[in-house]
Curated annotation (Swiss-Prot):
Pathway: Isoprenoid biosynthesis; isopentenyl diphosphate biosynthesis via DXP pathway; isopentenyl diphosphate from 1-deoxy-D-xylulose 5-phosphate: step 5/6. Its EC number is 1.17.7.3. It catalyses: (2E)-4-hydroxy-3-methylbut-2-enyl diphosphate + oxidized [flavodoxin] + H2O + 2 H(+) = 2-C-methyl-D-erythritol 2,4-cyclic diphosphate + reduced [flavodoxin]. InterPro entries: Dihydropteroate_synth-like_sf, IspG_bac, IspG_bac-typ, NO2/SO3_Rdtase_4Fe4S_sf. The gene is ispG. Its cofactor is [4Fe-4S] cluster. Belongs to the IspG family. GO terms for molecular function: 4 iron, 4 sulfur cluster binding; 4-hydroxy-3-methylbut-2-en-1-yl diphosphate synthase activity (ferredoxin); 4-hydroxy-3-methylbut-2-enyl-diphosphate synthase activity (flavodoxin); iron ion binding. Binds 1 [4Fe-4S] cluster. PANTHER family: 4-HYDROXY-3-METHYLBUT-2-EN-1-YL DIPHOSPHATE SYNTHASE, 4-HYDROXY-3-METHYLBUT-2-EN-1-YL DIPHOSPHATE SYNTHASE (FERREDOXIN), CHLOROPLASTIC. This is 4-hydroxy-3-methylbut-2-en-1-yl diphosphate synthase (flavodoxin). Converts 2C-methyl-D-erythritol 2,4-cyclodiphosphate (ME-2,4cPP) into 1-hydroxy-2-methyl-2-(E)-butenyl 4-diphosphate. SUPFAM superfamilies: Dihydropteroate synthetase-like (SSF51717), Nitrite and sulphite reductase 4Fe-4S domain-like (SSF56014).
Amino acid sequence: MGEIIHRSKTRPVRVGNLTIGGNNEVIIQSMTTTKTHDVEATVAQIKRLEEAGCQIVRVACPDERAANAIPEIKKRINIPLVADIHFDYKLALKAIEGGADKIRINPGNIGRREKVEAVVKAAKERGIPIRIGVNAGSLEKRILEKYGYPTADGMVESALYHIRILEELDFHDIIVSLKASDVRLAIEAYEKAARTFDYPLHLGITESGTLFAGTVKSAAGLGAILSKGIGNTIRVSLSADPVEEVKVAKEILKAFGLASNAATLISCPTCGRIEIDLISIANEIEEYISKIKAPIKVAVLGCAVNGPGEAREADIGIAGARGEGLLFRHGKIVRKVPEEKMVEELKKEVDKLAEEYFAKQKA
């Protein structure tokens, strides 16, 4: 596969201290599972998401208690905050006033034009964007009557309906999502959207399932979309701790070379030649490098048959043998280490590489 091409013609949109679209990297987003009015629990979860690599976080804003919590939450976190609003324009106004960096609301669903105008005016004054969220499971009645069932054409038509409402009010800081739980439908909808308008696209396979099944489904769908150069932000939706969503999203982006601030692990599937405890070593190293924000490729390989050749693809790696391992750096043997010190020595080398990377970045 050739290099992934970003949709460089996508309109850039500011969200807090980030710019989405243009030539910028794909941004990882997640959503809290706490009651938003419970500020302590919500902030604690967002802090965990930040640590895992989440770059934008969305909170549900179903009522006034949730909207009233926005200012305090915003004050205590370090990443842009998105308020998710349905139907009630007053909650959108309150969230904007409270410091939300973006709101997710469909303008066609909040009533009379003056209500939409009030939300747009407030968003303009604060310089925050609006995400239009189209979902195959909640398309407008007129769309379903026209197409008979959720289709990609219907989803794009729904998005355009909401986009035009905002454009008529001279509002263009728009982000669009077209989510479906059916992977093929989502892929087709995003492809059509990318050909139809230049607003940034937020990717997601909605209601994808539990940690295992949802990871597979999201990787299949989001991977297919990303491989076409489509997408500016991404959320993996799982029936699991949202930290797991961030981990999966990061791995999907790394698989396509779209994450410049994350370390990657290569490890072999093991076979009868293995004479070291490779699985536990690989798991420990994976956990160790998960918080390293440098594009380092680390290999943990089980034997001397394929190990040296595969290690050449990595920046640093270890190939196990009988009770010892060969430590490689950029494909060349650095030294032999006993099995009991393999993990410790590999971690030291990873740290050195990370320090070298950060030193170059500062230079």
